Amino acid sequence: AACAAAGVEERVECEIAAVEPPRAEGSPFTLRLADGRFERAGAVIVAVGGAIARGLLPEGVPFREPEPTLGPLATEPRWPRRLDNIRVRGALELWRPDSRGMDGRALNDGGFPMGTHEGERLVSREVGEVMFRKYGVSGIAAFNLRRLVEPGDVLAVDFVPWVRLCDMEAFLNRRRKLLRASLGRDVTWSDMLRGMVLSPVADVLLEAAALDGAHLVAKGETVRMATFLKGLRLPVTGLGDVRQCQVHRGGVSVRAVDDRTCEVRRVPGLYVVGEALDVDAACGGFNLHWAWASGLLAGWSAAERIADLASLADASGSSGSERREGAP
């Protein structure tokens, strides 16, 4: 309604093939349409997805090839397939090899990487929803870590983020003691995990720790289970389902634009906003906020530019008329 009241002309099914900068100062931009026609404009705001922006922009504008981000992660072990579509409230940690690399990391008999972080450093930790998929992990925690992942990184799934690792063994021993008093008998591993995690998750944890759910909890086994409850490891192999990615990373370099107006420094009157700029953020509405905020900055500046150009044109026209009237 506001656009209609202001006399804004809207075009649909009108594909822009290229944006050509003015050939001289004060001249308009040329917008080449896909059907061969063209339009003129005093200012242009590019507000498209990063993958489309490159073909529109003039040569020489610094640009980083877009890649999907804020999406699920593909992982190496096969056990997430058994938990497909199961959600847990937990935490994901992203670990990266240090200068010593990843050589020497042991695997147990089931092929599960042992819960050690020797030779690695913690890159980031996200607490929130973790959703297992056939290819790996999804959910907000995985989406946010996707922005930071590099080849060779490893995820560690923390199923009990409310308990510190240093307190986990004591937590399990106390739980065993309380269950024994409540049940009136010795406690099995199935008893220990029931109510802590979902049954399919418990099966995976027991396999990872090489424990039998029907066997009684033995002294020393709580240390092993604590390790996997606090960090069941998943080597990252890449991006999961690309269709689930919410934004692209890449686009026009932020160094190429004025941070107050989003105007391209080398091409006055050309503005780049939203996903077309190399700006991305975590989940939580930040990317949408950036799209609206950058659009407002560019819109205000473009409107001022158009008004200034109109004033110059009027002044030039008035001067010309005065000269003609005063001519002999």
Residue ranges and their predicted role:
Residues 133, 137-140, 247, 277-289:
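Glycine-rich phosphate/pyrophosphate-binding beta-alpha loops
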Residues 46-59, 141:
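Flavin (primarily FAD) binding-site architecture
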